[in-house]
């Protein structure tokens, strides 16, 4: 995946996507697989905001049943099934427990009814349907649950993902199918033709600056997509005629990394007072607990977890634990922003999670994406590209009407039996590349059928087969692969997004940061000053500190 902003010159694209989060990535992939001329730019790194700071869930929409959003539940369950089939390395099933306590806003009967509807909407076989559990059943599975007040509960299945890697794999596939993609490329302004779209103003070009070099480029396109998430209205404000209206509502969601108190189970439970719930997932031998849901009106680039968020989440989980967690038990924390479609009068938790497409009369050939979820990102991209194709009559090839992402695996997903593949491929990785077994198993599960590409740098440099300092199963080869093939240009790009290591292992990996910086320096031509500054910047960043 090459970053060549000069490729913008001399090309009029069919569609330019601004924003490299999951919505933009899925749209770029959909359009590229249909044969469109596609470009995607992001002012920061791909998955640099919301799409690396989510709850990591690919879920069937159980939480939406309470809001009677049945269409959204049906869509989410369909998309979850597709992702499991087309990218098994990016959507893995996890058992969820739902303990019910005295005083909860929902009774065991209501939960059973909701899960029965959930099963029916998903057309599940007997093995995947929910189970009703007694108090004793729950305690056998999670001995650390609080016994007092426990009435019983349920077990059902959903899926987890690595949100940033899901985003990256979509962008990689878009680039493999001809899309021109660039991170650290910010749109500065637009030029419009006042009568190009049936008498309405239409964007003809945009000026883009390379944030790494300061060089500016012009990019031309027939259609534009504003998929910048929390920055949607900031991009709209660049257009002449912008009226100051808001299309998205920003709410802050904080997650904390804690010890694995529920083992290999994920868990939902009520947060009192009110009707909110927390979710806790098994994540890299830890627990990932979230989330808060509060309005946010400040700079989207400065969102951080604060101590009030951490304490709120600890109070929520401690209600159902026999041994309460302390702030000293918190291993890490992160905060992201939901860019929800505006719904006047709704509280943050009640605001619809359905996505919407918005068009302004002062830019007839731009659609702004409002809302969206990891789970439904593929169908969002499909519907959006359908709308774009319908807006570009006269030169639309027949292939533009196809829906290729319904059946095309994501990179790494080309296998019919993932578990058998993982077992065989891990053995091959150890034999062919002489890497530690633990690293081989994790790499195969993370990258799927792309595992050999990930380990290829080892053939050039045997040092890249060694685990990073402080890690049992992360190799220098992955750093080199991310730089060469996934457009990792800064340490954060690898630590926060290509690997996610900083979210749960930054302290353990402190000694590995100079080692990674050396690999970046060798590949990108950094001098000693740049290398040392990158290390120092990482150490000062304080990704886990709550203010």
What are the roles of these predicted feature ranges?
Residues 11-13, 213-223:
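Core beta-strand elements of the Rossmann-like FAD/NAD(P) dinucleotide-binding domain
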Residues 226-241:
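Flavin (primarily FAD) binding-site architecture
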Residues 32-52:
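Glycine-rich FAD pyrophosphate-binding loop
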């Amino acid at each position: 995946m090459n970053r060549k902003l000069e490729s913008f010159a001399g090309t009029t694209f069919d569609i330019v996507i601004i924003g490299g989060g999951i919505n933009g990535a899925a749209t770029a992939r959909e359009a590229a697989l249909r044969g469109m001329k596609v470009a995607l730019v992001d002012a920061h790194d791909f998955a640099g905001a919301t799409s690396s700071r989510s709850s990591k869930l690919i879920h069937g929409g159980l939480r939406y049943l309470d809001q009677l959003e049945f269409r959204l539940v049906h869509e989410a369950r369909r998309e979850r099934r597709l992702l499991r089939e087309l990218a098994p390395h990016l959507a893995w099933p996890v058992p969820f427990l739902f303990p019910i306590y005295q005083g909860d806003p929902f009774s065991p009967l209501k939960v059973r009814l909701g899960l029965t509807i959930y099963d029916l909407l998903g057309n599940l076989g007997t093995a995947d349907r929910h189970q009703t559990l007694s108090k004793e059943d729950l305690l056998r599975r999670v001995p650390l649950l609080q016994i007092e007040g426990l009435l019983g509960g349920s077990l059902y299945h959903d899926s987890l993902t690595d949100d940033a890697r899901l985003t990256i794999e979509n962008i990689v596939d878009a680039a493999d199918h001809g899309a021109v993609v660039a991170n650290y490329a910010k749109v500065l302004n637009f030029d419009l033709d006042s009568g190009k779209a049936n008498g309405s103003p239409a964007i003809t070009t945009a000026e883009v600056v390379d944030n790494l070099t300061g060089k500016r480029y012009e990019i031309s396109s027939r259609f534009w997509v504003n998929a910048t998430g929390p920055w949607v209205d900031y991009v709209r404000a660049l257009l002449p005629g912008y009226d100051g209206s808001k299309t998205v509502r920003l709410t802050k969601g904080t997650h904390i990394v804690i010890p694995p108190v529920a083992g290999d189970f994920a868990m939902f439970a009520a947060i009192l007072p009110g009707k909110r719930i927390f979710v806790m997932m098994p994540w890299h031998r830890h627990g990932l607990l979230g989330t808060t849901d509060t309005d946010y009106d400040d700079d989207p680039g400065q969102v951080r977890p604060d101590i009030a968020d951490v304490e709120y989440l600890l109070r929520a989980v401690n209600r159902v634990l026999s041994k309460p967690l302390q702030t000293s038990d918190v291993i890490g924390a992160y905060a992201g922003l939901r860019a929800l479609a505006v719904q006047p009068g709704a509280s943050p938790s009640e605001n619809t999670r359905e996505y919407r497409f918005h068009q302004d009369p002062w830019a007839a050939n731009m659609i702004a994406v409002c809302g969206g979820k990891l789970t439904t990102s593929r169908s969002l991209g499909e519907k959006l590209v359908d709308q774009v194709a319908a807006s570009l009559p006269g030169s639309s090839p027949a292939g533009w009407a196809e829906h290729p992402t319904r059946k095309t695996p994501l990179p790494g997903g080309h296998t019919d039996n993932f578990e058998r593949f993982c077992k065989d491929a891990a053995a091959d990785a150890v034999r062919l590349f002489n890497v530690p077994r633990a690293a081989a198993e994790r790499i195969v599960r993370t990258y799927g059928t792309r595992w050999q590409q990930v380990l290829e740098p080892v053939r050039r440099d045997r040092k890249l087969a060694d685990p990073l300092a402080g890690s049992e199963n992360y190799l220098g080869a992955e750093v080199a692969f991310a730089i060469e093939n996934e457009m990792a240009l800064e340490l954060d790009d690898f630590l926060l997004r290509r690997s996610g290591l900083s979210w749960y292992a930054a302290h353990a990996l402190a000694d590995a940061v100079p080692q990674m910086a050396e690999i970046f320096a060798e590949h990108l031509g950094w001098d000693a000053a740049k290398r040392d500054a990158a290390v120092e910047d990482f150490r000062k960043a304080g990704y886990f500190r709550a203010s």
